[in-house]
Amino acid sequence: MKHIVKHIHFVGIGGAGMSGIAEVLVNLGYAVSGSDLSRNAVTDRLEALGARIAIGHDAANIEGANAVVVSTAVRSDNPEVLAARHQGVPIVQRAVMLAELMRLKQGIAIAGTHGKTTTTSLVASVLAAGGLDPTFVIGGRLISAGANARLGTGDFIVAEADESDASFLNLYPVIEVITNIDADHMDTYGHDFARLKQAFIEFTQRLPFYGSAVVCVDDPNVRQIIPFISKPVVRYGLSPDAQVRAEDIDARDGRMHFTVIREGRAPLAVVLNMPGLHNVQNALAAIAIATDLGVSDDAIQLALAEFNGVGRRFQRYGDVPSADGGQYTLIDDYGHHPVEMAATIAAARGAFPGRRLVLAFQPHRYTRTRDCFDDFVNVLSTVDALVLTEVYAAGEAAIPTASGDALSRALRAVGKVDPVFVATVDDVPDALAKVAQNGDVVITMGAGSIGGVPAKLVQHIQQKA
């Protein structure tokens, strides 16, 4: 590619999926430019690495580019897309560019409705501990690396495979992981769950004959597609028929202690430095891959024990002063689907038994809120106190019956929790100051702008002091 394409421009370069690919390309020696609507830590990092960053979208931004990379979130009438089309510059989907990177190395693609980012991070961390020095492209910041992407010298590239727009069908890895299959992004599949499952089957057909599909058999939908996978399958999970499974699971001190059972291997005692049964499952995927690639048990144990997590995935901010003179534990999480939220809430209950759980939640997308409305009501009813914001639209038109206010009214009707509704994320710090008490565990959650709230909370407390 490099003898033809020397300058690559990214429209929306600050996004999690785009920025990782851009960083790897910068490190490969390409001239990289990009635009976004605002600056963030990611754009600052890319600029420091040598990328040219423009704030705002303008036709002039693509000057000199041999290719323009877009995600499905970029509209066709974006001025940079229009300019590229007018100038005859190839417009490349993000997943297609990721597929090009995978052609340079042996790809390990992590797919599934939930858990992709954490599982990708665990796989990258375990392979790195085993001396394989992988390249990785992750949808969140790997805290130990301080970045969501890295160009390694080894043979493997570990990346998330996105089913939300079916773009994972562009990838041709040698190892695939399927963590679970759940009803999300159903607009892509015509609201037909069978079509979604078929897409995952087609994903496994991208594997070479020597490749393998590493699948979580605890998920009933994954289990249903196994008979249709024509390539070698490695089953992991907590189920008795899993080839890589966890037994004797014990949650202590915010960590998960368990024994790994693998066919033909001695039992392996593991401590995972993060809470939650779902993260045990994610770790098993990493263990299965690492075992297959010859990583030593010592390296596996070390990587999991020292895993520092991923930004916005049960990310701990420590103890924060509360308005009553005490302090509460602050955690931030990216969860935005009821299944993910339930797993995070369960992890918090396990890590902090007996403590009151306060959730500040920003729903993400009106269509998801509409499609999962009852499930949102059920999962939000399980916390002890709730601050709820208006839906983060992510470019969608508002749906009045699926608004944050509508969700709030439905929760009050059920009667298990009385939500404090705020119109904007900017109102969350004040609302939490009134709700949070000494000894509470407070979780800010959502895939939208609520990710900036933890830093504001700390600042809010300092200003009040």
From Swiss-Prot:
Q: Which UniProt keywords apply?
A: ATP-binding, Cell cycle, Cell division, Cell shape, Cell wall biogenesis/degradation, Cytoplasm, Ligase, Nucleotide-binding, Peptidoglycan synthesis
Q: Which residues bind ATP?
A: G112, T113, H114, G115, K116, T117, T118
Give the primary localization class. cytoplasm
Query: Do you know which InterPro entries this protein is assigned to?
Result: Mur-like_cat_sf, Mur_ligase_C, Mur_ligase_C_dom_sf, Mur_ligase_cen, Mur_ligase_N, MurCDEF_pg_biosynth, UDP-N-AcMur_Ala_ligase_MurC
Q: Which domain of life is it from?
A: Bacteria
Which Pfam family name is an example for this entry? Mur_ligase_M
E.C. number = 6.3.2.8
Per the record, the pathway is: Cell wall biogenesis; peptidoglycan biosynthesis
Q: Can the keyword ATP-binding be found in this entry's annotation?
A: yes
What Gene Ontology molecular function terms does this protein carry? ATP binding; UDP-N-acetylmuramate-L-alanine ligase activity
Q: What GO biological process, any one, is recorded here? A: cell wall organization
- Catalyzed reaction equations: UDP-N-acetyl-alpha-D-muramate + L-alanine + ATP = UDP-N-acetyl-alpha-D-muramoyl-L-alanine + ADP + phosphate + H(+)
A single Gene Ontology CC annotation of this entry is: cytoplasm
Name its cellular compartments: Cytoplasm
Protein family:
Belongs to the MurCDEF family.
Q: Which NCBIfam families match?
A: murC
Q: Report the PANTHER family cross-referenced here.
A: UDP-N-ACETYLMURAMATE--L-ALANINE LIGASE, UDP-N-ACETYLMURAMATE--L-ALANINE LIGASE-RELATED
What does this protein do, in the record's words?
A: Cell wall formation.
> What name does this protein carry?
UDP-N-acetylmuramate--L-alanine ligase
Task: Give the originating organism.
Answer: Burkholderia orbicola (strain MC0-3)
